[in-house]
Amino acid sequence: MLLSGSSSQSLAAALAAATGERLGDVTYDSFPDGEQLVTVPPAVDGERAVIVASTPTSDAHIEVLQLQDAARDAGASEIITVLPYMGYARQDDAFDPGQPVSARAVARAISTGTDRVLTVNPHEDGVLECFDVPAAGVDAAPQLAAPLPADLTDPVFLSPDHGATDLATSVRDAYGTGVTDHFQKVRHSGSDVTVEPSEIQTAGRDVVVTDDIVATGTTMSEAITALDDPARVFVATVHPLLAGSARLKLARAGVEAVYGTDTIECAVSEVSAAPAIADAL
């Protein structure tokens, strides 16, 4: 049985359709002081419970822990926790003295209530090692090729840095044509950083900028404005957080369209990560 977090209801429904698993009747309540309460159906007794819940907020993390506890208490035979988007995963190190490794802290908490974890395109694969139970990544990047225009002109698929070229390659391979490259960050001083493409020529070509997460859109917008006269620019991201004025920044930088998956359910969630998750289950 699939048990959805409140932030992943559409994705859970798509996953139910893809797998044929029942979609549990979960209810979400809150108290006047802000505390949350979830309720799972008693029919989960003796069944495998697959919890599907992105955690873009701290409240969402609490909800996952409650879903796990409720499912276990209701008699679930096995619990698999699917984190389409894992919050705090970018804090995978103590970057300054006295700071926690937040990814490890939340992974340990989630591990206590589950038998296995799946998460979609984690920011760093090393995050998977933070869990105390078997954990695996799911690649939903190929899904992002589907909404791209079929008539891209000599397309270039760009990643934000060399370390993320695999994601750009996944989208390019799924699209079927084009080349991949990556932006380069050049640090001139402690606060002066410029972002520019490698040697690839973009003039007159369609450019697809790919990334696992687009949060504020600031760095990506700066990178896009550094491109040399591209024909069209599109952004494809697995996790479209698009915080604050991110969408406006990208539009002002010349981005024609933004395509994301439903790991974060929003207006640009053009494709679902459900097929990739279904394969992993």
From Swiss-Prot:
Mg(2+) 2 binds at residue 161. The keyword rRNA-binding does not apply. One of its GO terms (molecular function) is ribose phosphate diphosphokinase activity. It holds the Pfam family Pribosyltran. Binds 2 Mg(2+) ions per subunit. Its EC number is 2.7.6.1. It is found in: Cytoplasm. Its cofactor is Mg(2+). Pathway: Metabolic intermediate biosynthesis; 5-phospho-alpha-D-ribose 1-diphosphate biosynthesis; 5-phospho-alpha-D-ribose 1-diphosphate from D-ribose 5-phosphate (route I): step 1/1. ATP binds at residues 33-35, 90-91. InterPro entries: Pribosyltran_N, PRibTrfase_dom, PRTase-like, Rib-P_diPkinase, Rib-P_diPkinase_arc. Keywords: ATP-binding, Cytoplasm, Kinase, Magnesium, Metal-binding, Nucleotide biosynthesis, Nucleotide-binding, Transferase. It catalyses: D-ribose 5-phosphate + ATP = 5-phospho-alpha-D-ribose 1-diphosphate + AMP + H(+). Gene3D superfamilies: 3.40.50.2020. It comes from the Archaea. SMART domains: Pribosyltran_N (SM01400). The active site is at 185. PANTHER family: RIBOSE-PHOSPHATE DIPHOSPHOKINASE FAMILY MEMBER (PTHR10210), RIBOSE-PHOSPHATE PYROPHOSPHOKINASE 2 (PTHR10210:SF32). HAMAP family: RibP_PPkinase_A. This is Ribose-phosphate pyrophosphokinase. The gene is prs.
